Amino acid sequence: MRFISLLLLLTLIFCSKEATGTSDRISETTINLDNIETDPWWNDAVFYEIFVRSFYDSNADGVGDLQGIIQKLDYLNDGNPNTDTDLGITALWLMPIFPSPSYHGYDVTDYRNIDEEYGTMNDFKALITAAHARGIKIVIDFVGNHTSDQHPWFTASASNESKRDWYLWNSNKPSYNGPWGQEVWHERNNSYYYGVFWGGMPDLNYTNQEVTNEIKNTLRFWKEEVGVDGFRIDAVKHWIENGDQQENTAATLAWWRDLYVFQKSLDPGLMMVGEAWTSTQNIAPYSDKRLDYCFEFDLSYALIDGINNQTNSGLKSKMSEIISTYETNQYGTFLTNHDQDRSFYRFGMDERKAKLAARILLSLPGVPYIYYGEEVGMLGQKPDEDIRRPMQWTSSANAGFSSTQPWHPLNNNYVNYNVANQQLESESIWSQYQIWIKQRTRNTALRSGNYDFIESNNSRMFSYLRADSESNTAFAVIHNLSSQNTDDITIRINNSSLTEGTYNLINILNNQNMGSINVSSSGAFDTTLSEVTLAAYSSFLLKLEGS
């Protein structure tokens, strides 16, 4: 049942009529957000980000495509939790699949079609059907802040036709630059239009209600007629400008609040995750019933830096801020994405660090995202094309990606770092991803349990308690960020949600008893795991079992 009252709908209609002018006329509606039902399936998901062009080529043209993803679904999740040949992810984020003049697709020319290099709408619907049969959700990249300058809307706007005010025009070039000092006003036909990223990506004018209505109808199309499970929304903080204030404006936040109500009216389970590339405190308002959640960039930096610098201080403080800032678990976690140097490159090709990063990512709270190829140690350093290279499937010609020359050169390390090789090794990067994905999927405490930092006598240990009262399960997760083995590990918590009693610490990866703890009535414990050694860049996943 969808709980949206008639009064709420009338309020939205009235607000929409008032939202056709400049940005200062857009204000947040007064609505009872508690009356909006949501179905947060993403809290139980492990996402996998795919650049379709680089995943798998099914038709020998050197370009990855939708049929290629279909052919590789059993690698991602074969639908059988008892097998160990699939990775085990439960949701896909597809980078842009709309028609576009660029290889990356972030400048759209048609919001209701599929890039012909990737396939057809029927191919995409077949992918959704096949994915759903395996328990995999499908989320698509929606680039709504701007279009291509080749989009029919913009060509009509530039020629002073009916869609002039679908974009932002000025007869004289404003004097200000963009948020990072870039040119944002671009000349066309003796006028200037606004494009925060570059001239080939003109920003849409969301103070025009016609634009908002068109985008809402487009989202409805992809949900109701095509069947997607959600959207990753690009560049959410740039939606509406107020003069030279070009990020995080009040009008932008108001627009997203209105869209949230619309989104949940389509389907309580329709997910929207936002890219707001900014600090935790600036991200937080977008996650407050405007989008379901946003990506946590600061945490990704803290995670990689913590491993490289062998200290828990940044991770400890960042997790403390996150826990106090967001609604429980409502943030996306990741190592790196398609806009950043790949994590294996950041770790200097140290496999131990790559494995440790995977274990931390998959045992922390939040909604984890894996960038394709991360699980096999793909390398990549900017420019962007080089962090989006073809997937490394095998050591054979073209890395098993295609039977012909790929659209972009392969990484040199594909002969050793590929799916086929790593699936044969029990201690490979791939194996660590698979093992910890499955542990997360099987254990509610690792997906949605409480998080409490575990103090230690060693700043190179990053440890925490994940506890779930409903399933009555808890885990102590202990990571050694150091390049040295660590003995006699002290673990200490002053209070937690644990009930009083004595618990054995069982390493669920090998069923070994690692000792015990005595928990007080406040949930506190303090013990030393004597005669226990945690190897460099290694982890313990200890289940607390009452004795």
Predicted features by range, described:
Residues M1-L7:
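Sec-dependent signal peptide recognition
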Residues I13-F14:
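C-terminal motif of bacterial Sec signal peptides marking the signal peptidase cleavage site
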Residues D24-I140, N145-T147, P152-A156, S162-K163, ...:
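N-terminal structural segment of carbohydrate-active enzymes
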Residues E37-F47, F51, D149-G243, A250-P365, ...:
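Alpha-amylase-like alpha-glycosidases and glucanotransferases acting on alpha-linked glucans and related
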Residues W42, Y260-L266, T278, S287, ...:
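Loop/helix patches that line or flank the sugar-binding groove of alpha-linked glycan CAZymes
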Residues V46-E49, A91-P96, V139-I140, G230-R232, ...:
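Structural recognition of the beta-strand scaffold that forms the well-ordered cores
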Residues I506-T527:
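Solvent-exposed beta-strand/loop surfaces of large extracellular or lumenal domains
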Residues S520-S547:
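C-terminal beta-strand-rich structural cap/linker in extracellular carbohydrate-active enzymes
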